[in-house]
Swiss-Prot record:
Protein's UniProt keywords contain Repressor: no
GO biological process, one term: double-strand break repair via homologous recombination
Entry keyword set: Repeat, Ubl conjugation pathway, WD repeat
Protein source organism: Drosophila erecta
Name of this protein: WD repeat-containing protein 48 homolog
Coiled coil (UniProt feature): none
Job description of the protein: Regulatory component of the Usp12-46 deubiquitylase complex. activates deubiquitination by increasing the catalytic turnover without increasing the affinity of deubiquitinating enzymes for the substrate. The complex deubiquitylates the wg/wingless-signaling receptor arr/arrow, which stabilizes the receptor and increases its concentration at the cell surface; this enhances the sensitivity of cells to wg/wingless-signal stimulation.
SUPFAM superfamilies named in the record: WD40 repeat-like
Gene coding for it: Uaf1
Repeat region (WD), residues: 26-65, 71-110, 113-152, 164-203, 206-245, 248-287, 290-329, 350-389
Family designation: Belongs to the WD repeat WDR48 family.
Keyword ATP-binding: no
Amino acid sequence: MLTHKTCQARKKMQVSFVIRDAEEKQHRNGVNALQLDANNGKLYSAGRDAIIRVWNTRTDSSEKYIQSMEHHNDWVNDIVLCCNGRNLISASCDTTVKVWNAQKGFCMSTLRTHRDYVQALAYAKDREQVASAGLDKAIFLWDVNTLTALTASNNTVTTSSLTGSKDSIYSLAMNPSGTVIVSGSTENILRIWDPRTCMRSMKLRGHTENVRCLVVSPDGNQVVSGSSDGTIKVWNLGQQRCVQTIHVHKEGVWSLLMSENFQYIISGSRDRNIIVTEMRNPSNKTLVCEEQAPVLSLGYNIDKTGVWATTWNSDIRCWKLPMYDRCTMNSSGGMDAQWTQGGTEVACIKGGAAIKECAVLNDKRYIITKDSQDQVVVYDVLRVVKKEQLGAVDYEAEVKKRNKQVYIPNWFTVDLKTGMPTIVLGQEEVDCFSAWVSIEAGLPECVDPTTEIKINYGKLLLEALLEYWTPPHSIPPNEMEPDMHGNGYFQVPKHTPVIFSEVGGRTVCRLLVRDAAGDSESTLLHETAPQWVTDVVIEKNIPKFLKIPFFLQPHPQMTKPERTKKDRLVANEFIQCRKVCEHVLEKVLNAETTPSGGNANNSLQNSQSDANSEGSQLPAEERIELWCNDVVVDPNMDLRTVRHFIWKQSTDLTFQYKTKQNFNYDGSIGDSLERVTRKY
């Protein structure tokens, strides 16, 4: 028997997974950050779809994709290349900082020091030092050489922290020599530290809204900041003041890029414009381009004649930069300066569509989505696959057409934050074990439709997601016993990412379905999987049935209206109404007992006997009619569907019954509660 590690202090957990292709070569949402390895011509992009992708910028082919780097499960907000391009550091909304082998694309280690979204990174190239900051108001300093040396056995790392921030940090910058680090936050101020001593040296006021982007000059004497207030400010740290305010954008400035000589500012804004401005003469500016969406990040191309730009959309474009020509002679013989033509799109890395809308169908197995390109798709949540590509059809009409009049409790939620459907299973507001259905309704393709087996969607799905998990120290299965791995009905795609996380909090474990058999993954699952998961996956416990109380009484049109007794029963909520008809027929009306004819003659008795014999061969639903709220109930409906669509009241469900034929009846309803509960 497996002994699962438990801890009373452990936070409540949830399990989520993503329905996606085995290889997602395109970004499926906006791109938050870029890093260029100029030596190898590789462009790294950090996506809101939780994936870092690598692109070959030296090819003219439209196929620039090299590989994906996957281990985050929420937006990747920032990335930095270090160690001459050998390693990459990433920061994410999943509250982690990850260290990657940039060449091979695998995650080397995960840092879980932050307690909230990690928004920004800063890198001091000369010192191989990285700083991270986020919404938890904390700034941590990391030695890159130490991070890249971490192993499974040597996994302890120390960090220095910079304290004093009073609000969420959205931007961070450091000069190459690591003598100055600057943070920007929703305090609307800049805070400056000396990372060598971890001492705060000053704070600078001037912005009126969140400081979204920062650049520090190589010598550490100047800082350029961009803010949601729409301004760009130049700060002199020696004078501890703002020396210039630049107004070139109509909305917030979200990205900054400086020329090597620190004379020109390239800025990207929420207003979708990318503008080049001479820092000493802000009136000398020119529009590079107008993007299709707010600009999130900017980065030079290899020869710095162009700039890569990312936006809320998933495309990544490279725009030719205009050059500032000071050698143009004017009509009076003097020299004028002017910008050469720029703004031409020289390359584009196409992105994919992000899912923007989602509807869960009443059967609680399928969802219908609509993406940013108006494509409508049907997904099978239970089997974790795309079921049908409908194209650019009427989304609402498809939802209406495919919704059946059936009620099944919610057992999962859908998160579209990454642009791909993420299904969340838990035990909080939505109980993943609440959906019991008959197997002919839930898995008609798997069994004989005449069977009366009941299945639990949540249990089957968890068993499929963790099919390959063999916990350490578990007893090997007996050779004479059947293998109990999986759910016995279906498998899910092996490439499916499965994430264990705290409810409303940090990620604890992420793995692919196929990797659960690995020793390290198995041990990690054993340490992190919540008890409600191991109960069904390892212990093979059956989730409890949910029951519905209801009243049963004769219809006013019954031949014996004096029978007005109203009895309360309890049954499993997934019981079909035909079972209630059978109960009425067998236990209330005693239809199986041949009624005596009294003083009637033999011919009449024989006639009645023949009729009763013929009628007894009919199914109960053809002999008994159930009513609810003056509506005839479909015998194929289950109790919860009747309560949801017909009864529509908070009080106990009430049925009325009457016969469809003139059957004689006699009997009582006194023992119905116990018998209905046991049989159904």
